[in-house]
Amino acid sequence: MEKPALEVQLKTLPNSPGVYQYFDKNGKILYVGKAKNLKKRVTSYFNKNHDSHRIGVMVKKICEIKHIVVASETDALLLENNLIKKHQPRFNVMLKDDKTYPWICIKNERFPRVFPTRRLIKDGSEYYGPFTSFKTVNTLLDLIKGLYKLRTCNYDLAEDKIRNGKYKVCLEYHLGNCLGPCEGFQPEEEYNNNIEAIRQIVKGNFKDSLQRFRNQMKQHSEKMEFEDAQRIKNKIDVLENYQAKSTVVNPRINNVDVFSVVSDEGYGYVNFLQLSHGAIIRSHTIEMKKKLDESDRELLELAIVEIRQRFSSNSTEIYVPFKVDVGEELKIVIPKLGDKKKIVELSQRNAKYFRQERFKQMKIVDPDRHVNRVMAQMKEDLRLGKEPRHIECFDNSNIQGTNPVAACVVFKNGKPSKKDYRKFNIKTVEGPDDFASMEEVVFRRYRRLLNEGEDLPELIIVDGGKGQLSSGVKALETLGLRGKIAIIGIAKRLEEIFYPEDSIPLYLDKKSETLKIIQQLRNEAHRFGITFHRNKRSKTALNTELESIQGIGEKTVVELLTHFRSLKRIKEASQKELADVVGSAKAAIICNFYHSE
């Protein structure tokens, strides 16, 4: 692959269903495709030799890849069709004809007909779907026809024409497939009740019909009519597996713009979905750099105006996740339920994916840019004199004062530097005293760094509130480092940030990158300290029992544990096995201790 930018786009594609679009150097769409897994499908074009010359030619022309994330593979198929018909890409052949996916139509007329169609006509008729194949449509229509007797003729069944006897029943009536509304044999109310039941079925509301089918199946089974019972069972299976509609296309939603936003400390990401005749025809996401810590609402209002101008949108209705003010001529809808809500959620998913991909691309193309941004943000958020490129965090660990230890973890440029981690046994403190323990380890840590001429951190974090912070400050003061290294404390309950000699804590935004890094430091220090403490307790328990044996010293204990790895194995070892490690005399002492009556 010749273009680094393209390689980055491939690496950051999501493992999700969706539609991808290939563009040439002039920004013209070359190809639109669907995928169950975008990353696998798109990457496959660039990872193998192609039997088709056409594909090879197309791949050489690709300069940019865009994609739209959807909820399912079916949605991807439908959206692919919409985009191909909209843009007519050069390399698309299979779906470039004038065919479209089928719908089920309930005609706007007296005694409505129910039939499949590829055309959506604005005459007040109801359309349900779309379906990915006529096989699915016909299966459902066969089911409906088996349940309800509907007319198939195209007569105008006006009341006066029926009353005047203009029509005669046809063969369908004599075959039992129609109840003869054309001659007035079926009341209009009864027919309309059947149509309402059909509406519920094609919309996916099957509860009543399923219950009726189950009752029928039970009755057939009780009468030993097993073939009829199986026929009803097949209908139940069809209903249960049928999905009435797609989150991508809905004919009742027409000429609408959909907007959503996600943001972090520095940037906002606004996604735009354009719907025409109930189908998504465009998805576009923009990145907006915050200047004055703008809210999501402010970002969305700015973006809506910009995007509508850019794409010359004439929609008079927009869907958004919350209230915005963008002009009186627009109808603002904040969906709470149903299809409209699902479309807004789809827009939000695309905005989130775009944001994730931007971060991944940034780290691949310019890793320093991301680090620099985070460091600058931490300096500003924490009111520091310089960027905290080197941060150290301390945590104490003990249980009722037993085996007191402490841990120091080190982050450099926002990432753990595990080779610099340090653990401490508390030496000068008796009993459970977190404050004195914190003072000891901070003092020992930086006395050593000073003595060895090592670099000092720009920021120290102590896990705890005002008391632990005061202890850390006292240690720095003793070393003459107070004011030379910034030090803060973080209290767990409310994630409060404490500063020396400041009784009012700082509360960072929960979405803040700064808070996330501080929490990561605190959690890592806690994990490292707990692991050390647990290991020390286990070792102490082993050593205490072995060293209590008269004639067995520390050196012998170490030899035994190194060889046998556990106290249980030492107890189970034979005298000969023990003698091979520590000699026959000590082996006899150990065996006598564990195996004497």
Curated annotation (Swiss-Prot):
SUPFAM superfamilies: C-terminal UvrC-binding domain of UvrB (SSF46600), GIY-YIG endonuclease (SSF82771), RuvA domain 2-like (SSF47781). The keyword Cytoplasm applies. Residues 15-93 form the GIY-YIG domain. GO terms for biological process: nucleotide-excision repair; SOS response. The keyword DNA repair applies. Residues 207-242 form the UVR domain. InterPro entries: GIY-YIG_endonuc, GIY-YIG_endonuc_sf, GIY-YIG_UvrC_Cho, RuvA_2-like, UVR_dom, UVR_dom_sf, UvrABC_protein_C, UvrC. One of its GO terms (cellular component) is cytoplasm. SMART domains: GIYc. Its main location: cytoplasm. Gene3D superfamilies: 5' to 3' exonuclease, C-terminal subdomain (1.10.150.20), GIY-YIG endonuclease (3.40.1440.10), UvrC, RNAse H endonuclease domain (3.30.420.340). One of its GO terms (molecular function) is DNA binding. The UvrABC repair system catalyzes the recognition and processing of DNA lesions. UvrC both incises the 5' and 3' sides of the lesion. The N-terminal half is responsible for the 3' incision and the C-terminal half is responsible for the 5' incision. Belongs to the UvrC family. Interacts with UvrB in an incision complex. NCBIfam families: uvrC. This is UvrABC system protein C. It comes from Christiangramia forsetii (strain DSM 17595 / CGMCC 1.15422 / KT0803) (Gramella forsetii).
